[in-house]
From Swiss-Prot:
It is an enzyme of class 2 (transferase). Gene3D superfamilies: GHMP Kinase, N-terminal domain (3.30.230.70). The keyword tRNA processing applies. This is Ribonuclease PH. Belongs to the RNase PH family. Its EC number is 2.7.7.56. It comes from Afipia carboxidovorans (strain ATCC 49405 / DSM 1227 / KCTC 32145 / OM5) (Oligotropha carboxidovorans). Pfam families: RNase_PH, RNase_PH_C.
Length: 238
């Protein structure tokens, strides 16, 4: 029995609301149960120095948590003078995931920066960030299209979304909240495109090693869950 009472293959209530920030070219408020992330997409007419003159653009991401996004206040990383290894890992993951779905040549020599700010954390902040980041990116590209700023209409080649899975009390389950994640024997994150291809898989045995059969069960749960998330992304962008 899951603490929330959900079925093993049941997502938390998910909400993807785009266009929530007045000044950003693209934005999305994403909610996975009690996890909430505000995502913005900013268009910048500049590129990293190493990309200049190559005839293509770039999509990058930054990630952070508000001090009281968690049960106890967490010091702002800016006040500590450096980002944690976890923060760097997550924002690189978000950027990598988004770039797999973007035609960077069609984007042109400009950069889109995705900012993911966790307002409230109850498990799955990186997967929620990726799922909401795609909506914010699509919102930004729609803004650009309306202003005839794109070389063609196919800059965004596919959706990308992410979900967590794990083995909790011996049972493979979908979309772990904090109570489950902190007690799970195994936890994994899956990032997939809209057509079901894998972008990234992160899996860790916290207590007991897991079998290939259990991994395939987790992946099947993830495929099903991400399919539903992609449908919600499409609804958000309709």
């Amino acid at each position: 029995m899951r603490p929330s009472g959900r079925a093993p293959n049941e997502l938390r209530p998910v909400s993807l609301e785009r266009g929530v920030v007045k000044y950003a070219e693209g934005s999305c408020m994403v909610k996975f149960g009690d996890t909430r992330v505000l995502v913005t997409a900013t268009l910048e007419e500049r590129l990293p120095p190493w990309l200049k003159g190559q005839g293509r653009g770039w999509v990058t991401a930054e990630y952070g948590m508000l001090p009281r996004a968690t049960h106890e206040r967490v010091r702002r990383e800016a006040s500590a003078g450096k980002q944690s290894g976890r923060t760097v890992e997550i924002q690189r993951l978000i950027g990598r995931s988004l770039r797999t779905t973007v035609d960077l040549v069609a984007l042109g020599e400009r950069q889109i920066t995705i900012d993911c700010d966790v307002i409230q954390a109850d498990g799955g902040t990186r997967t929620a960030s990726i799922t909401g980041a795609w909506v914010a990116l699509a919102d930004c590209l729609q803004w650009m299209k309306a202003r005839n700023m794109l070389k063609n209409d196919n800059v965004l080649r596919d959706n990308v979304a992410a979900i967590s899975c794990g083995i909790y009390n011996g049972t493979p389950v979908l979309d772990l909240d904090y109570a489950e994640d902190s007690e799970a024997e195994t936890d994994a994150n899956f990032v997939m495109t809209g057509d079901g291809r894998l972008v990234e898989v992160q899996g860790t045995a916290e207590r007991t090693p897991f079998s290939q059969e259990e991994f395939l069960q987790l992946m099947a749960l993830a495929q099903n869950g991400i399919g539903r998330l992609v449908e919600l992304q499409k609804i958000a962008m309709a």
